[in-house]
Regions:
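Helix-start/capping segments and mature chain N-termini
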Residues: 1-11, 15-22, 45-232
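Short secondary-structure capping/junction motifs at helix and strand boundaries
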Residues: 8-10, 26-37, 67-68
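Short, internal active-site loops enriched in acidic
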Residues: 39-44
C-alpha cells in the first residue's frame, strides 16, 4: 500500500513488527487490534506533497468482537448500499488508503439507520463486491463456495486464509463475478476480515440465508488457526 501511495516508510518491516509487539505487551492486549498508520507531514500544504516527511504511528486496543457476539451466532443483516466501489482505473483500489473508506462509512451509517448491521457494496459494474470492511462468501445448494473476484477491492488476508481452509476440507471455491440477482440462489453467506473474522450473514435485503454447518466449521477452523497458543 505504501509503495502504491508513493510513501517511503522510514522503518523496516522488522522494526514495525518489533514496535507492535512492544506496544501489545505494554498495553496488556490479549484479544485486540493492531493498527499501524502512515501519513504525510505538513511541510507542503498543497496538492503536491513530494517534500513532505512520512510519519508512522502504531495503535493497539482490546477488541473482543467487531460485531455483537450474539449476532455472530444468529447472523448479521445487510442492506445493499447505494454507494459503489470505484472503478479500478479511478483510484488505487488495492491499497489500505483511508480515503477509500469514506464511502464505506457512509454506507454503514445508512445501513444502521435502516436497522441493519452492515452494508453490501456493489462494484462500478453492478456486481457484488464486499461489505464495508470485509470480504463476502456465499454457499450454494451443492455445498460449494462463491466469492467475488477481487479486482476492485482488497483481497483480504482473512479471505485468502479461509479459501485455503475450505480447499483443505475439499470444499470447492469459485472466485467469479456475482450478480445481485444471484443472491436468492444461495443458501448461506458469511463475511471475512481481520476484525470481522468469519461472521455469518442471515440476510441481505430480502434474501434470507441459514447459518449452516459449513460456515460454523470454517469459523472453528479459522479460530483454531489464529489463536494457536505456544506450549508452556
Amino acid at each position: 500500500s505504501a509503495k502504491r501511495m508513493g510513501f517511503d516508510i522510514p522503518y523496516s518491516e522488522e522494526q514495525i513488527n518489533i514496535a507492535s509487539n512492544k506496544i501489545i505487551a505494554s498495553q496488556n492486549v490479549e484479544n485486540g487490534y493492531v493498527r499501524p498508520v502512515a501519513w504525510r507531514g505538513s511541510e507542503m500544504m498543497a496538492i503536491s506533497a513530494q517534500q513532505t516527511k512520512i510519519h508512522v504511528a502504531i495503535a493497539t486496543w482490546e477488541w473482543g468482537s467487531y460485531f455483537d457476539p450474539k449476532l455472530k451466532v444468529e447472523g448479521i443483516k445487510l442492506n445493499i448500499s447505494n454507494w459503489r466501489r470505484p472503478a479500478p482505473n479511478t483510484i488505487p483500489w488495492d491499497t489500505k488508503a483511508s480515503g477509500l473508506y469514506m464511502i464505506c462509512t457512509l454506507s454503514k451509517h445508512e445501513a444502521e439507520k435502516q436497522g441493519y448491521t452492515d452494508s453490501l457494496m456493489l462494484d462500478h459494474e453492478g456486481n457484488v463486491a464486499e461489505a464495508t470492511g470485509a470480504n463476502v462468501f456465499f454457499k450454494d445448494k451443492n455445498g460449494e463456495l462463491h466469492t467475488p473476484t477481487p479486482d476492485s477491492f482488497l483481497d483480504g488476508i482473512t479471505r485468502r486464509t479461509v479459501i485455503g481452509i475450505a480447499k483443505s476440507k475439499n470444499i470447492k471455491v469459485h472466485e467469479r463475478k456475482i450478480k445481485p440477482e444471484e443472491l436468492s440462489n444461495f443458501v448461506g453467506c458469511f463475511l471475512t476480515g481481520t476484525a470481522a473474522e468469519v461472521t455469518p450473514v442471515s440476510c441481505i435485503a430480502e434474501n434470507q440465508f441459514k447459518v449452516c454447518d459449513t460456515i460454523i466449521d470454517l469459523n472453528e477452523s479459522y479460530q483454531t488457526l489464529v489463536r494457536k497458543k505456544k506450549a508452556a
